[in-house]
Design a protein with these regions (language model features):
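Conserved AMP-binding/adenylate-forming
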Residues: 290-293
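Gly/Ala-rich beta-loop-alpha elbow adjacent to hydrolase catalytic centers
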Residues: 242, 246
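Flexible phosphate-sensing "switch/lid" loops adjacent to ATP/NTP-binding sites
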Residues: 1-233, 239, 256, 280-283, ...
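Conserved catalytic-site region of short-chain dehydrogenase/reductase
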Residues: 249
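Class I SAM-dependent methyltransferase SAM-binding "motif I" and its flanking Rossmann-like core
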Residues: 254-282, 286-288
Length: 437
């Protein structure tokens, strides 16, 4: 089993060249490349193995913006401490600082900003006020912190109104991954989505989803505590969907002969006649999805041949199905390779797929909501969300908000290779592209 120390040691030796190659491919296609760091750029205990912050900035010869989150408190100390811990050649890349998520009277912040400019010798490029109801995807760990829990009382009251919301329970597996799979579904007016942490949480649900997980074998061990039996019982009468690791869990067995996770093998829930072998090679592909024509959840409306969508695969494992089992979809990888994905039980109640991001496509999500509501004896949805268009509008709103508050000219000038009006001129690059971090 791999340990954290081994992972960090392999970062620079094995992973960093791959990251640099990916950057170069982007630099060949775009005039500006934005590098997003992770955590702090000044974690001195991890400096030797950090490949996403200043090491990457050095490789791309990037102009950098240091951003502090004032909502966490202590923003001035964080900015000053970060600059103090950076090495001289790293500090030289910082073109300015900005403060994010500010709430309150900006005039109260102004003296601190002025003092920081004097002390750091760097300009403030602006303060971004807090933006309410941003409605955009967050990282898994962040998204789950505030996600609704069924145990918190979401569905304790009996609801017999056929116009009520469809209750979707996402099983809170250990090391849950790709929580953004459910953002579009949760945005539907006729859907109430929450996370299930105990077997009793499934009692009032209409649909159960087993999400992706970074540790399928560990999730199966956790399911042995009672949740697995609850899902099996639920599946006898109501729909269950498994995505990626959740799909593997629905099968007969998951084997790990190469020690990708913990090694060994475990029995799955046995709801689909498929078997999975975890592999060393990780599949990461954007795909186009063409769901097969079948009666979703055993009820009308059928999934039609005209419905299609996009998504992505990111998994370590090969799943083989019984030859008589119906596939969920045909998937096209890279625009050329056509493969079969997933599985559907004979009664249409159990669906498994490796494709993430399916619910973000309006036609696929709408088909799911309609079929699930019909299966649950609920009225057809009175309204369906145009999530794709709404998501683009939210990005535009955020971009306008940031653009109005930040002076990005110094960074853009550096990225374009031009002299910045208020900042030192940067040296020329041997390549024809510039980068921002």
């Amino acid at each position: 089993m791999a340990h954290a120390r081994d992972y960090h040691r392999s970062n620079v030796r094995e992973l960093f060249p791959i990251v640099v190659d990916a950057y170069r491919r982007l630099a060949d296609r775009y005039d500006v490349v934005v590098l997003e760091g992770a955590g702090s750029p000044a974690e001195i205990n991890l400096r030797a193995s950090d490949i996403v912050n200043m090491r990457m900035a050095q490789a791309a010869d990037a102009a950098c913006l240091l951003v502090g989150d004032i909502d966490r408190g202590g923003v001035f100390a964080a900015l000053l401490g970060t600059l103090a811990l950076l090495r001289p050649h790293e500090r030289a890349r910082i073109r300015g600082f900005a403060i994010n998520k500010f709430r309150g009277d900006l005039s109260l912040l102004t003296p601190g900003i002025a003092a920081m400019q004097r002390r750091l010798g760097l300009p403030s490029l602006g303060v971004v006020p807090w933006l309410n109801d941003i409605g955009l995807d967050e990282e898994d760990s962040v998204a789950l912190d505030d996600a609704p829990r069924i145990a918190a009382g979401a569905w304790h009251a009996a609801q017999t109104d056929r116009s009520r919301a469809l209750r979707v329970a996402v099983v809170a597996l250990p090391y849950l991954a790709n929580a953004t799979d459910f953002a579009a579904l949760a945005a539907e007016p006729s859907v109430d989505l929450a996370y299930a942490e105990a077997p009793a949480d499934l009692e009032r649900a209409d649909v159960v989803i087993l999400p992706g997980t970074k540790d399928t074998l560990g999730a199966l061990r956790w399911l042995d505590g009672g949740m697995g039996d609850a899902v099996i019982a639920f599946a006898q009468r109501k729909p269950v969907i498994g995505i990626c690791g959740g799909y593997q869990i629905l099968g007969l067995t998951v084997a790990d002969p190469h020690g990708v996770e913990a090694g060994g093998a475990r029995s799955g829930l046995g709801l689909l006649p498929v078997r999975t072998v975890l592999t060393r090679e990780k599949v990461t592909r954007a795909v186009r999805v063409y769901p097969r024509r079948f009666a979703l959840f055993g009820r009308e409306p059928h999934v039609s041949d005209e419905i299609q969508g996009t998504g992505y695969e990111i998994h370590m494992g090969q799943t083989t199905a019984n030859s008589r089992l119906s596939a969920f979809a045909d998937v096209v990888r890279g625009g050329v390779e056509r493969v079969v994905d997933g599985a559907v039980s004979a009664n249409g109640l159990i669906v498994g797929t490796y494709v993430h991001g399916l619910f973000a496509d309006d036609p696929i999500r709408w088909a799911f909501v309609r079929a699930a509501r019909a299966r649950s004896g609920l009225h057809a949805p009175a309204q369906l969300a145009a999530y794709s268009a709404q998501r683009e509008a939210r990005f535009d709103r955020l971009a306008a908000h940031v653009r109005a508050q930040l002076d990005l000219q110094p960074l853009l000038a550096a990225a374009a290779g031009a002299a910045a009006t208020r900042l030192p001129r940067r040296r020329s690059l041997p390549t024809r592209r510039r980068s921002l971090r």
